[in-house]
From Swiss-Prot:
Effect of residue 97 to A: Reduced DNA-binding, in fragment 66-112
Notes concerning its domains: The C-terminal domain binds DNA and the N-terminal domain is involved in dimerization. Both domains are essential for normal function.
Reported effect, residue 101 to A: No change in activity. Can still bind DNA and form dimers
Keywords in alphabetical order: Cytoplasm, DNA-binding, Repressor, Transcription, Transcription regulation, Virulence
Disordered: annotated segments: 57-79
Main subcellular location of this protein, as a coarse class: cytoplasm
Protein's name according to its UniProt entry: Nucleoid-associated protein Lsr2
GO cellular component: cytosol; nucleoid; peptidoglycan-based cell wall; plasma membrane
Its job: DNA-bridging protein that has both architectural and regulatory roles. Influences the organization of chromatin and gene expression by binding non-specifically to DNA, with a preference for AT-rich sequences, and bridging distant DNA segments. Binds in the minor groove of AT-rich DNA. Represses expression of multiple genes involved in a broad range of cellular processes, including major virulence factors or antibiotic-induced genes, such as iniBAC or efpA, and genes important for adaptation of changing O(2) levels. May also activate expression of some gene.
Disruption phenotype: No visible effect on nucleoid structure during anaerobic growth by whole cell staining. Sensitive to atmospheric O(2) levels, at 2% O(2) no difference in growth up to 14 days; required for adaptation to anaerobiosis, at 21 days nearly 1000-fold decrease in survival under anaerobic conditions. Consumes O(2) more rapidly. Has a significant lag in recovery from 7 or 14 days anaerobic growth. Decreased virulence in lungs of BALB/c mice; no visible lung disease at any time point. Increased sensitivity to reactive nitrogen species, not more sensitive to H(2)O(2) or mitomycin.
GO molecular function: acyltransferase activity; DNA binding
Subunit structure: Homodimer. May form higher oligomers via protease-activation.
UniProt superkingdom: Bacteria
């Protein structure tokens, strides 16, 4: 005997019937998902439209990350000190602390 299992998504907002889509949104660093009918999804987007228009976009859709995600690779204290010393001797303006600009690091690697 065969069984058929059907999963029906119900509108999370008002429970009025089947949800047509899952909407993802974020607030205060927390991402939410809500299953909504087309009508309620349109209403949510309309309600948020004025806030979205006044805000700044800080990211897009998530993508899978490859590798360690550390970019060019971390540099240790000794290497950082050597790069800063080389940069000062060669006319680059670098701070005593903090991030070393990528162009300075590239110039250091090209020269050494």
């Amino acid at each position: 005997m065969a069984k058929k299992v059907t999963v029906t998504l119900v509108d999370d907002f008002d429970g009025s019937g089947a949800a047509d889509e899952t909407v993802e949104f974020g607030l205060d660093g927390v991402t939410y998902e809500i299953d909504l009918s087309t009508k309620n999804a349109t209403k949510l987007r309309g309600d948020l439209k004025q806030w979205v228009a006044a805000g700044r976009r800080v990211g897009g859709r998530r993508r899978g990350r490859s590798g360690s995600g550390r970019g060019r690779g971390a540099i240790d204290r000794e290497q950082s000190a050597a790069i800063r010393e080389w940069a000062r001797r060669n006319g680059h303006n670098v701070s005593t602390r903090g991030r070393i600009p990528a162009d300075v690091i590239d110039a250091y690697h090209a020269a050494t």
